[in-house]
Amino acid sequence: MHRYRTHTCGALTEAQVGDTVRVSGWCHRIRDHGGVLFVDLRDHYGLTQVVFDPDSAAFAAAEKVRAEWVIRVDGRVRLRPEGTENSELATGKVEIYATDLEVLGPAAELPLPVFGDQDYPEDIRLRYRFLDLRRERIHGNIMKRGQIIDSLRQRMKGQGFFEFQTPILTASSPEGARDFLVPSRIHPGKFYALPQAPQQYKQLIMMSGFDRYFQIAPCFRDEDPRADRLPGEFYQLDLEMSFVTQDDVFAAVEPVIRGVFEEFGGGKPVTQNWPRIPYAEALRKYGSDKPDLRNPLVMQNVSEHFRGSNFKVFARLLEDPKNEVWAIPGPTGGSRAFCDRMNSWAQGEGQPGLGYIMWREGGEGAGPLANNIGPERTAAIREQLGLKDGDAAFFVAGNPEKFYKFAGLARTKVGEELKLIDTERFELAWIVDFPFYEWSDEEKKIDFSHNPFSMPQGGLEALNGQDPLTIKAFQYDIACNGYEIASGGIRNHRPEAMVKAFELAGYDEATVIERFGGMYRAFQYGAPPHGGMAAGIDRIVMLLCGVSNLREISLFPMNQQALDLLMGAPNEATPKQMKELHIRPALPAK
């Protein structure tokens, strides 16, 4: 007999009745029923009920065990008494009558229980993550994560992609976030950087003559953590293709992502034909470049109905051609209580309020705005928005560049409050035609809005003859249920176009050569047209596990302060280590 087990705790069925078996695992739950001890023994594979009778030689040892002790049990498999079966367990028709018990690993008093699904403070869960990971829900999330990654890998290979590994120690480059720097012992005063993404390497792979690359890539960015972004590191499905257009990338990626959502989405409907929504349209209709299309509400520009009206606040705003008034429809939201609640919510978001019109039975508009603009304009707004009696509309006014994010939040809030969002589905879409450049108020100059290596629509001709802020890029995202889950672009593979693109953003050719020397050099020796993207594995897993916090699908995450409470990172380096690296701390004054 094997030293620890002949079967796992999820393997025993009626077929083993009468067999002598050995199992090992954790004491999940211990119950005393009239002097007979019942232990639910748990391992990675499942649960098995073990019975310790007072007549058994193992009973005395069993009386000493506590929750989460690791034990080995020998015994005979028998059917559970009629009426005590558990249909929710694979082993629910049988139990083990124990004849021998060995304690393999006793456990101290638990800081959080493994049995059950109670909420515990996050700092406790992260400090004792090894206990937290034993809990059924999060254990299942981690297993599902592995299965999703395996499925992505197989689907990519099925599409003709080959898996490569790119370096982890690389050069620092400006890619939109702070780098994690690694001091070089061999080259005093110089630093490696952990890659924010394998962007340059994957393009170099295409220039090296390979055709379709992918990897499950670790990425590192020193940025502030959020619930949908882990501090420090994350993983992405990174891919690149040679001799492709934007449509070719879409055709390769769409079945991979759609297939994974269909496989692991629990039967929820998944968008089959993904819409392609231009960036500007997404902001205009949904107030977001990652719209949640489960929400049916579409915002509309209703400026004409307020221009020259008696509602002077909006009428004066509209004298500036940059300003607009947008309407958010609110089907079934035409009650004073709901409209006032939305107005209070807007004030809580730092806004002066949220204007509204509600239509009561009989079709007459009500509310301060309706009273000011009159029945004719009110009826025209209702007709444009397709509203009916009992509905409402909410209004946001000003410069859309400044208010679109709030308008998007208001659209989401209305959809949630009126229960218009179908949470039992996955709505996926391509967001396309991103602006190539944006104006940086902080630096008072034009800068790249997304990825500096993307191809501008119109190529070198657009860079030479067009207002930079009107240039669009061959750049695209995948949005799913209000999250950006992937981003990519067709690359700028002509060296003169690359230099010009950086020049417009304030970087001269010498800077380009200094920062991107390897890629610039490769461009001189025949670079193929190429493009690709990267999908955020953590966010995809988060959506498929039905959670809203990435720490629920990550093995050993840091907390919101970028601290690893289990391992004690970051920690101080020893004087010897600092000396070897030729560095000394210059700490801020306390």
Curated annotation (Swiss-Prot):
GO cellular component: cytoplasm
Binding-site list for L-aspartate: 175, 221, 450, 491
Localization terms from the record: Cytoplasm
Binding annotation for ATP: 221-223, 484, 536-539
Residue ranges, annotated region (Aspartate): 199-202
Annotated keywords: Aminoacyl-tRNA synthetase, ATP-binding, Cytoplasm, Ligase, Nucleotide-binding, Protein biosynthesis
Catalysed transformations (reactions): tRNA(Asx) + L-aspartate + ATP = L-aspartyl-tRNA(Asx) + AMP + diphosphate
BP GO annotations: aspartyl-tRNA aminoacylation
Site positions (Important for tRNA non-discrimination): 33, 83
Alphabetized CDD domains for the sequence: AspRS_core, EcAspRS_like_N
Main location, first listed in the record: cytoplasm
A single GO molecular function term of this UniProt record: ATP binding
The EC number(s) this enzyme carries: 6.1.1.23
Family classification: Belongs to the class-II aminoacyl-tRNA synthetase family. Type 1 subfamily.
Primary role: Aspartyl-tRNA synthetase with relaxed tRNA specificity since it is able to aspartylate not only its cognate tRNA(Asp) but also tRNA(Asn). Reaction proceeds in two steps: L-aspartate is first activated by ATP to form Asp-AMP and then transferred to the acceptor end of tRNA(Asp/Asn).
NCBIfam families: aspS_bact, PRK00476.1
Subunit-level organization: Homodimer.
Name of protein: Aspartate--tRNA(Asp/Asn) ligase
Gene source species: Azorhizobium caulinodans (strain ATCC 43989 / DSM 5975 / JCM 20966 / LMG 6465 / NBRC 14845 / NCIMB 13405 / ORS 571)
Gene symbol of the encoding locus: aspS
